[in-house]
């Protein structure tokens, strides 16, 4: 039931699922006879979801997430006929990327006359997907059919466990039930949102012989939650000292070392257009920040003397130089831009790169420069998410692909520009823009949130702050303020600090 209140992507997904199910009239109240013959005052009609494509996709995503969390090894996905087939089809094809199998209730009298349809080999292990589990009888019938073809099925994933003996019956037969929802969660949600009252709650519990004595009311917002604003992974963040000892990246070791020495996970975005403005702000910020972020192509009088002073200041004040160039071209063009007029590779420690160009264009060129001691450049940050409203990084699959590219090239990719933690790899750092303690948005589509949300809820490591400091009449005070709040948020549960 913690999923009704926890601040995780998986929890938000379940809450959104229940909200949409309620809106789609999935929960029906009256007098209904179940397949088992039992009379129930509530009927949960998951077939209603078929008429709502968004809800069908959401359920399939949620089931797929349950499969991933379970870490069960399997070769294919089988939907229990027939109500679970749409969910199994979407989950297998769109999320799990595994073959779909179907068991017929009876073999055809023509054609191949097969009872089991799909791609499989003898002794393959399958996972089963069901919509509602009451007694578990339908699942065990399918398991018996699979055994006749030497197929193994010991795990079933369902949308709803009605908590009426099915789990135990399946367990006795060697089948583990993984449920997305159970009746306690459903009833708590319905009660908390006012869909049912005390009398209905007690009537349902009594009729279905559920082991609850009194309803629980939780504070549950009725609005849908933005799933992309929550971490993609839910494992506990590794302590900084351990991350520093585990990583093989020289840049990440350097960054984590600076963070621990200066007690700072603050990156300042110095978005000025003249060298003088930049140097003045960097002089003030240097003692308090982990990194200084620049847009070199926005500086109208950019010159080599500026980069000489910049690197000297970085060495003296112990900070990283971060050029936010957002490279996104072919490998050869990237190389020309890195070593061309502004000689970015000579003075920047790290640069940003779009994932759109693909792994080959990123890894080859940037690895070559990062391994060459004649250049200062030693790593890249891959753009996984942006903080602007309507960003195309929110398109399905973009962030996941960026994470895959980074995971496979951790010697040169040191982390992400992101809104939330997107990778389970502890040696990839999550840098997040869009942080402001005093404003929520501007007129150009920029959206901001607070430090605690960015660090503790969304599990980012480093905050990137710009106008919250640079537009202030007291920038040093703001630097101290952001540094302290961000560091406290990052290290609150870190025993290594």
UniProtKB/Swiss-Prot annotation:
Region annotation OMPdecase: where it falls in the sequence? 233-496
Catalytic residues identified in the record = 324 (for ompdecase activity), 326 (for ompdecase activity), 329 (for ompdecase activity)
User: Per the record, GO CC terms?
Assistant: cytoplasm
Pathway involvement of the protein, from the record: Pyrimidine metabolism; UMP biosynthesis via de novo pathway; UMP from orotate: step 1/2; Pyrimidine metabolism; UMP biosynthesis via de novo pathway; UMP from orotate: step 2/2
Q: Where does UMP bind?
A: 271, 293-295, 329, 333, 387, 446-448, 466-467
A Pfam match is OMPdecase
Question: Which keywords, in A-to-Z order, does the entry hold?
Answer: Cytoplasm, Decarboxylase, Glycosyltransferase, Lyase, Multifunctional enzyme, Pyrimidine biosynthesis, Transferase
User: Which residues does the annotated region (Domain linker) include?
Assistant: 227-232
> Binding of orotidine 5'-phosphate: at which residues?
293, 326, 329, 333, 387, 446-448, 466-467
* GO MF, one example: orotidine-5'-phosphate decarboxylase activity
The lineage is: Eukaryota, Metazoa, Ecdysozoa, Nematoda, Chromadorea
Localization annotation: Cytoplasm
Where this protein primarily resides, as one coarse class? cytoplasm
Q: What is its EC number?
A: 2.4.2.10, 4.1.1.23
What protein name applies here? Uridine 5'-monophosphate synthase
The signal peptide here is: none
Q: Which family does it belong to?
A: In the N-terminal section; belongs to the purine/pyrimidine phosphoribosyltransferase family. In the C-terminal section; belongs to the OMP decarboxylase family.
Q: What happens when the gene is disrupted?
A: 56 percent of embryos fail to hatch and are arrested at various stages between the bean stage and the four-fold stage. 30 percent of L1 larvae fail to reach adulthood. Embryos from the bean stage through to hatching have abnormally enlarged gut granules which fail to acidify. Their size and number decreases at the L1 larval stage. Normal gut granules in L2 larvae and adults. Lysosomes in intestinal cells are mislocalized. 7 percent of embryos lack attachment of the anterior pharynx to the buccal cavity. Exposure to hypertonic conditions reduces the number of vacuoles in mutant larvae.
